[in-house]
Amino acid sequence: MMKRRTAIKLLGSALPALYLSKKSFGAENWGKAPFKPDWVSLESYEVPDWFRNAKFGIWAHWGPQCQPERGDWYARGMYEEGSDQYQYHVKKYGHPSVFGFKDVIHEWKADKWDPEKLMDLYKSTGAQYFMALANHHDNLDLYKSSHQQWNSTNVGPKKDIVGGWEKAAKKRGLKFGVSVHAAHAWTWYETAQRSDKNGPYKGVPYDGKITKADGQGKWWEGYDPQELYAQNHALSRNSDNGGSIHGQWHWDVNSGVSIPTASYCENFKDRTVELIDNYNPDMVYFDDTALPLWPISNVGLEIASHYYNKSKKAHKDKVEVVVTGKI
């Protein structure tokens, strides 16, 4: 059996969490649980045979970012004045002070999506597992979420995208995974706090800081854009430099990154645990270093521990699930 990668262990043990989670899961008792939310406990994890033996899987990195057909970082780039995505957005949709990414989501209907037909194709290619995008950095949950109002069953297609993928994959005997990217929305959307520095809209703020009160009479009335954009905070250092986010990706407090609040971290945890509990994925990929929001929060440790404990209980004392990530 393969052990959890040594690199992850070393990264994880580097710093203590800035925010320790103050809430525990309703049925969780860490004192008696096989896996506890700390790196030492997680070292006992062993990769299940199915993942070691699976050589080919397919990942559908598909969500509202595909609607404009201009790249998966569209919701960030459209707020960068002068960029290709900004210019495309202004020409196709209008100025981002008026038509933001929330409105792109509204246009995404997924009306030609046929998960059953697609899964037949994926199965025919020899795929042994399938990965669905559960959320991207744009922060829209593609599943029915009670902790994120901005989800695909409420807005956009008004469909349970993850649920459709899950049903189709498991029906055909494929292992089912989800990828989770939303932890970075806090800094990723910082471009939406800006305004143009030139032209007729000079100084007019983009829609990144609008609130629920601004939605009266609009299609999104009753929804709080801050649940999507998460921009009611100070900008990270050098945020006007589009490349600075890469040096701040690891939440290093010395990098000048704006540190997410404890409530933001807890909400991410609640959303992810609900995803795990309701859709029972065989694998979760986090687009993060080590685990989400580490080392500023231990919510990633709690998510992983909960996931492993849940699997161990369901599979006669064996852990049959996988957590993986960017690094």
Task: Label every PLM stretch briefly.
Residues 1-15:
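N-terminal secretory signal peptides and thylakoid transit peptides that target proteins
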Residues 12-15, 25-327:
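Mature catalytic domains of secreted/periplasmic carbohydrate-active enzymes
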Residues 21-23:
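C-terminal segment of classical bacterial N-terminal signal peptides
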